Amino acid sequence: MLENKYEKMYWPNGQYVMGIDEAGRGPLCGPLVVASCILPINYENEAINDSKQLSEKKRNELFKQIIKDAYYYEFKIVEPKEIDRLDIYHATQKAMKELSESSIEHIVTLTDAMPINNESVIDMVKGDAKSINIAAASILAKVLRDHIMMGYDILYPEYGYKKHKGYGTKMHLEMMDKYGLNKLYRMSYRPCQVREIKLF
């Protein structure tokens, strides 16, 4: 059960809370997806939890429910070139800051352990296991990113993106060695740096 400390603090006053989380900091290829979510005041759904604790089927079900129920949500998709230009930490921070500055009415923004230079933003360690708004954002980000990678699997079936979603599994590294790197790869990541770029 999520403790929802800040929701319990602000909801009784009729004030909205925004949660922000990301998916895709670790993969070797594909985008980083950052999502924000503002759930209705006093919203309840005991199934919503940190996306990493949920099955793929459950995440997909909750994605549809959150999209339907949310007061507001938004996505930022950060492409590999931007990740390489800024580094993954600063690319994540930049996207979260932009989402936190939304003009949609909310009293405070909660992030999952990402400090942002904004007095209305609170970074919470393991926030996706503490706040329903962050947990909802984590589900939105994870499901959207997985679907993007499944789309790339159609374009590049030889890499097996549908299975590993771009993470550095043994199978994925073997496919990188066999086929080289396409434009989806993050060249600032060490496993990519040591492999030759495949030109198209």
Where are these regions (language model features)?
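RNase H-like, Mg2+-dependent phosphodiesterase core
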Residues: 1-200
